[in-house]
């Protein structure tokens, strides 16, 4: 879904923003604090229901306002989101109210590339698991269904473990069965997708870090040789003592291994940033291969990447048919990259929350 129109109301210092005639690449420049990143934040809110900067709606809803609204239009779809300060939200697709955020997310596959962040590598399994599940959601049709049932059973089982101390196997049996059934499905789906993803990943890794050898290794979160049900039965008493479920796909990890150890231990900060970009580009490539185009948010491109890496990233995103919304302090170098690569783009100047077209 490529956006042709974007309206933003009451997101941080953006009181009213109306953008038309959006291009494959849309570049927002201005001083720090002008509101550039808030534009990306608003698009992220529309696609995912949350900000990438804070989990608290009142922190991004304009001061003394009750809500924030983001609306976008493509050649075929209209989608909108109203977020209340309470956290409640109203979502619409083509004028009809929809019940789940997933319905918007399916229409608007979105990747946020932040060249300053190394969280995916340095901050434990959760962000890597989320990265994998983003891909699963968009390329494996049955994943969301299985994940919903698994998550529901996990929540119920953990509630029992937290509230009751003398639980028998019979008490947990219904949840064990549901966790086992859907957990095995999730494991099988993830294993297949990681194998496919690794092919795309190696291609993008070779372009950004040609001297590095890195493999994606999926760790399922339970002992696959005996199965999840056996782990749940074996860990029954320990789970009661811990008050949570230790084994299952919710504990999975995507390990990034080099011949010299794990990526978080052996790579430099600069290498980690390029590795994360390669991971996300390869996911975008996998969607592109199934005729799904991704909207990409690219924050502060020129701050962390050298000129060669900047040009390679822009060129690759263009090859993959992505629509890009990027922020920069140095729009001159970005303009040069786009001109050199003959990419259609639009410049926007941002000043104190006001966004205006700028000369290309």
Swiss-Prot record:
Residues reported to bind ATP: 30-37
Keyword DNA damage: yes
Subcellular location per the Swiss-Prot or TrEMBL entry: Cytoplasm
Record's keyword terms, sorted: ATP-binding, Cytoplasm, DNA damage, DNA repair, DNA replication, DNA-binding, Nucleotide-binding, SOS response
GO biological process: DNA replication; DNA synthesis involved in DNA repair; double-strand break repair; SOS response
GO molecular function: ATP binding; single-stranded DNA binding
GO cellular component: cytoplasm
Principal location: cytoplasm
InterPro entries to which the protein is assigned, alphabetical: DNA-binding_RecF, P-loop_NTPase, RecF/RecN/SMC_N, RecF_2
Coiled-coil regions listed: none
Function of the protein: The RecF protein is involved in DNA metabolism; it is required for DNA replication and normal SOS inducibility. RecF binds preferentially to single-stranded, linear DNA. It also seems to bind ATP.
Family membership: Belongs to the RecF family.
HAMAP family: RecF
Protein name: DNA replication and repair protein RecF
């Amino acid at each position: 879904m490529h956006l042709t129109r974007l309206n933003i109301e009451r997101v941080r210092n953006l009181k009213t923003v109306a953008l038309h005639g959006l291009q494959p690449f849309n570049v927002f420049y201005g001083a720090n604090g002008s509101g550039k990143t808030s534009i990306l934040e608003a698009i992220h809110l529309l696609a995912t229901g949350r900000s990438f900067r804070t989990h608290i709606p009142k922190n991004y809803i304009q001061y003394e306002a009750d809500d924030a609204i983001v609306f976008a239009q493509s050649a075929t779809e209209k989608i909108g989101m109203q977020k209340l300060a309470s956290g409640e939200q109203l979502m619409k697709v083509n004028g009809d109210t929809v019940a789940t955020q997933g319905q918007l997310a399916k229409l608007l596959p979105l990747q946020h590339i932040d060249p300053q962040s190394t969280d995916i590598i340095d901050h434990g399994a959760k962000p890597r698991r989320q990265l994998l599940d983003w891909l699963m959601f968009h390329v494996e049709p049955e994943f969301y269904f299985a994940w919903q049932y698994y998550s529901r059973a996990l929540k119920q089982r953990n509630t029992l473990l937290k509230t009751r101390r003398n639980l028998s196997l019979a008490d947990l049996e219904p949840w064990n069965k549901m966790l086992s059934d859907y957990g095995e499905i999730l494991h099988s789906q993830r294993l297949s997708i990681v194998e496919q993803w690794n092919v795309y990943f190696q291609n993008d890794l070779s372009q950004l870090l040609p001297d590095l050898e890195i493999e994606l290794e999926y760790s399922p979160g339970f002992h696959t040789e005996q199965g999840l049900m056996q782990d749940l039965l074996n860990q029954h008493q320990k789970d009661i003592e811990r008050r949570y479920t230790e084994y299952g796909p919710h504990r999975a990890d995507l390990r990034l291994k080099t011949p010299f150890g794990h990526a978080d231990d052996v790579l430099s900060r600069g290498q980690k940033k390029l590795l994360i970009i390669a991971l996300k580009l390869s996911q975008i490539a996998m969607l592109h291969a199934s005729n799904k185009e991704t909207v990409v948010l690219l924050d502060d491109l020129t701050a962390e990447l050298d000129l060669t890496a900047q040009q390679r990233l822009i060129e690759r995103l263009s090859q993959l048919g992505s629509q890009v919304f990027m922020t920069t302090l140095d729009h001159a170098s970005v303009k040069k990259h786009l001109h050199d690569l003959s990419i259609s783009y639009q410049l926007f100047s941002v000043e104190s929350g006001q966004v205006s077209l700028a000369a290309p």
